[in-house]
Amino acid sequence: ENEDPFYYDYETVRNGGLIFAALAFIVGLVIILSKRFRCGAKKKHRQIPEDGL
């Protein structure tokens, strides 16, 4: 029935694209949040030595 080489099952293509987009979004959030928490945990207040003023 589907002898045309340019026939696409658009429902499958759409579902695959939505899954890919959702995974890319989640991975991006994880990367952003991990960088934010890592940088926030390591950030220390720099103490200025009193004799240096």
UniProtKB/Swiss-Prot annotation:
GO terms for biological process: potassium ion transport; regulation of monoatomic ion transport; sodium ion transport. Keywords: Ion transport, Membrane, Potassium, Potassium transport, Sodium, Sodium transport, Sodium/potassium transport, Transmembrane, Transmembrane helix, Transport. Its main location: membrane. It is found in: Membrane. InterPro entries: ATNG, FXYD_motif, Ion-transport_regulator_FXYD. It is a single-pass type III membrane protein. One of its GO terms (cellular component) is membrane. The N-terminus is blocked. It comes from the Eukaryota. Highest levels expressed in the kidney and spleen. Restricted to the basolateral membrane in renal epithelial cells and varies in its level of expression along the nephron. The chain crosses the membrane at residues 16-34. GO terms for molecular function: sodium channel regulator activity. May be involved in forming the receptor site for cardiac glycoside binding or may modulate the transport function of the sodium ATPase. Belongs to the FXYD family. Regulatory subunit of the sodium/potassium-transporting ATPase which is composed of a catalytic alpha subunit, an auxiliary non-catalytic beta subunit and an additional regulatory subunit. This is Sodium/potassium-transporting ATPase subunit gamma. It comes from Ovis aries. The gene is FXYD2.
